[in-house]
Amino acid sequence: MSLDKIMNEAISPWMKGDGPDSDIVLSSRIRLARNFKKYQFSTMQNEEEAKLIQELFKKEFINKTVEPFGEFELLKMNELTPLQRRVLVEKHLISPNLAGTEYGACLLSESEHISVMLNEEDHIRIQCLFSGLQLSEALQSANQIDNWIEKEVEYAFDESLGYITSCPTNVGTGLRASVMIHLPGLVLTKRISRIIQVIQKLGLVVRGIYGEGSEALGNIFQVSNQMTLGKSEEDIIADLKSVIQQIIQQEKMARELIVQNSSIELEDKVYRSYGILANSRLIQSAEAANCLSDLRLGIDLGYIKGISRNILTELMVLTQPGILQQYAGGPLGPEERDYRRATLIRERLRIEKN
């Protein structure tokens, strides 16, 4: 695995999967927060400690293979260009917070299922990504990597509290489980606000596609647990999965309602968006996201034939500003990005139809 390969292959292998409930659930993510016992939290640590953590991971973990994820490579943030950091964020491999750090790093698996962020809010954040609704499978893989790292690292752990983390809401299991879910039916029927209120009352958090502070582009929402103390990992996963399954049922009911009551209007909306995507010469990120959401809904409902449903996930990543500029070989102005975005979408749709 090389940096060039990571940068130039925008679609991570996990994105090409077709997991359970993938007509509505795009991906499942598990993140485990861990800290070294002997160092101050990242928010308080000095440059020397941050570098020592990097060096330990460089010595013990790079070029090592863990099946089925392949070999691991260490990417140091201060050795990457701002554009390269942005690409990693847009591929969901690192957080925007890590991208802005001087001594942050990322231990990345060849399959890109696993990303271990270093010197972010916590010393170590293990992230595991799977397609569809596969929270239990993602947790099992994250625990496998956690055990691998713990052989070389003494974690900050308290017998009564659990894992000690920088943010109090992560104390305990240190587990953050989240699901990326496509909810156009609930948005179109104007039920999404009520659903979000119910989700929040259950102690879960709803965010946009790139996490905290981001908007829900393309009717894609991220639902995650909030508290990690006082519950086992299995209970956290079970509770989140139960809520997600109820949201899936609500989304399916909303789609059925639209088809029953507004079928021709929905079909028109789908084909108008398809026409924009297939023919535009300039298209901005937000418009592309909304049109791709409509196209994906049309594919799921059988209006559009011969196009993979994975096209939403793929093109939502491929058409992000950083990845467009990476493919172009350097910075692009807004209009140049819109032109390249439109061209890429047209070409991708043409390949699908052929």
Curated annotation (Swiss-Prot):
Its EC number is 2.7.14.1. Keywords: Allosteric enzyme, ATP-binding, Kinase, Nucleotide-binding, Transferase. It comes from the Bacteria. SUPFAM superfamilies: Glutamine synthetase/guanido kinase (SSF55931). GO terms for biological process: phosphocreatine biosynthetic process. The lineage of its organism: Bacteria, Bacillati, Bacillota, Bacilli, Bacillales. Catalyzes the specific phosphorylation of arginine residues in a large number of proteins. Is part of the bacterial stress response system. Protein arginine phosphorylation has a physiologically important role and is involved in the regulation of many critical cellular processes, such as protein homeostasis, motility, competence, and stringent and stress responses, by regulating gene expression and protein activity. It comes from Bacillus cereus (strain ATCC 10987 / NRS 248). PROSITE patterns: PHOSPHAGEN_KINASE, PHOSPHAGEN_KINASE_C. This is Protein-arginine kinase. Appears to be allosterically activated by the binding of pArg-containing polypeptides to the pArg-binding pocket localized in the C-terminal domain of McsB. The keyword Repeat does not apply. A motif (RDXXRA motif of the pArg binding pocket involved in allosteric regulation) lies at residues 337-342.
